[in-house]
Design a protein with these regions (language model features):
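Metal-dependent phosphohydrolase cores
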Residues: 1-102
Length: 102
């Protein structure tokens, strides 16, 4: 995972506010997409481990192959990388510009 975090593409997230210009109205809204992505990766990892533990304790609930550490890595990486490909203006770009281009 460190190999991905250390790339220039991921490091550029340090310069992007997660909430755009909201920090002008809400002074505490200053976290970056980098910080957000690290946090989402952490939560993805914790959630996955919780689901694995629940699967082991319940005969009726089987989320996925309990013994697969690659599943944990994949879901953690999905959390880490979920914001990496956003265009300018983030979700506004996703909703408006991409829709217009279709």
């Amino acid at each position: 995972m460190w190999e991905i975090i250390d790339t220039p593409e991921f490091q550029r997230l340090r310069n992007l506010f997660q909430l755009g210009n909201a920090h002008y109205v809400f002074p505490g809204a200053t976290h970056t997409r980098f910080e957000h992505s690290i946090g989402v990766a952490y939560l993805s990892n914790r959630l996955t481990h919780h689901l694995i533990k629940s699967s082991k304790e319940s005969k009726s609930f089987n989320f996925f192959d309990i013994n697969s550490e690659s599943n944990v890595r994949c879901l953690t990486l999905a959390g880490l990388l979920h914001d990496l490909g956003h265009g300018p203006f983030s979700h506004l770009f996703d909703r408006k510009v991409i829709k217009t281009l279709k």
